[in-house]
Amino acid sequence: MFMNKKVMIGMSGGVDSSVAAYLLKQQGYDVIGVTMKLWQDDDVVEIEGGCCSLSAVEDARRVANKIGIPFYVLNFREVFKEKVIDYFIDEYLEGKTPNPCIACNKHIKFDDFYKKARQIGCDYVATGHYAKIEKDESTGRYLLKKSVTDKKDQTYALYNLTQEQLEHTLLPIGDYEKDRVREIAKEMGMAVHNKPDSQEICFVKDNDYANYVKKHSKKRIEEGFFVDTKGNILGKHKGILYYTIGQRKGLGITFGKPMFVIDINPINNTIVLGDNEDLFKKELIAKDVNFISIDTLEEPLRVQAKIRYSAKPSPATIHRVGEDTIKIVFDEAQRAITKGQSVVMYDGDIVVGGGIIEKSL
């Protein structure tokens, strides 16, 4: 039992963080439940599963009352707008496809939220993420490891965690299957036991990110041209933010064969279209790299790397090319390597590290 160890847990009102809070209480921790009030416009307050809608706050409050822990709502709207929403908008305007959940974990949940917890004397922060943290006694390093089920594993979104953060973070449901988590919630009489998983970007209604960016951007969205790989004009596009690498449907123009978005050039406002085989590349450059299982990359290292949340890790070799920049060379070409997405590297179930894809080669 961990009597007198104080932990502040982020509660979204969903089943995962609710059960995580319950498990911590059962283990003897002094648990404080907190819902983070993030930025949301009036028209998206009640997104189904939205993590800071009024209903989500009330769900979290009811769970906290049921398991007998204090509950608070903390306002992170300003920093969330600056570090997540503005970043999200800027990246799309640059022809990239960002992952706002990774930015939120890096800047909000495991930075500002973490600092707030430490300021009030908490020993740990906790979340309902599906991942595990272990200490390697031989090296003294804290390791981030995949959860027991690959289907729900969320290590991809947590690669920015530092050694200090890992030391003071608890992930109570990393050893549980999702079905078991729901069972525990039902056994405890939690109304959230059958609450649907959130599937959308929490601040974007109906997942319509393009119109969200258009509405909130100070920059005018300009039409431009589709071009082929040789630069020949094929037609007009309605603005680069409406397209992503690998896209085939919704181009608004028809050809005699399937055509795919293979590159987006914000400088001259063009979108390059090509064949499916043009999407396959073996190399990429990643920046803002954070390593977890190693301190620095001294020499080429064999890993398994995944280029998006839903991808399977693929064998590759990583090479250092700068202070926080690496080149990844895959054994087999990867389809639709996308600027702005994260690439995360693994050694089996251990997270080696990750970074933001700058370009494919």
Curated annotation (Swiss-Prot):
ATP binds at G10, M11, S12, G13, G14, V15, D16, S17, M36, G128. Keywords: ATP-binding, Cytoplasm, Disulfide bond, Nucleotide-binding, RNA-binding, Transferase, tRNA processing, tRNA-binding. It is an enzyme of class 2 (transferase). The record marks H129, Q341 as: Interaction with tRNA. GO terms for cellular component: cytoplasm. Pfam families: tRNA_Me_trans, tRNA_Me_trans_C, tRNA_Me_trans_M. The active site is at C104 (nucleophile), C202 (cysteine persulfide intermediate). One of its GO terms (molecular function) is tRNA binding. Gene3D superfamilies: Adenine nucleotide alpha hydrolases-like domains, HUPs, Translation factors. Its EC number is 2.8.1.13. It catalyses: S-sulfanyl-L-cysteinyl-[protein] + uridine(34) in tRNA + AH2 + ATP = 2-thiouridine(34) in tRNA + L-cysteinyl-[protein] + A + AMP + diphosphate + H(+). It is found in: Cytoplasm. InterPro entries: MnmA-like, MnmA-like_C, MnmA-like_central, MnmA-like_central_sf, Rossmann-like_a/b/a_fold. Disulfide bonds join C104-C202. Residues 152-154, 308-309 are annotated as: Interaction with tRNA. GO terms for biological process: tRNA wobble position uridine thiolation. The keyword Cell wall biogenesis/degradation does not apply. NCBIfam families: PRK00143.1 (NF001138), trmU (TIGR00420). Catalyzes the 2-thiolation of uridine at the wobble position (U34) of tRNA, leading to the formation of s(2)U34. Belongs to the MnmA/TRMU family. This is tRNA-specific 2-thiouridylase MnmA. The gene is mnmA.
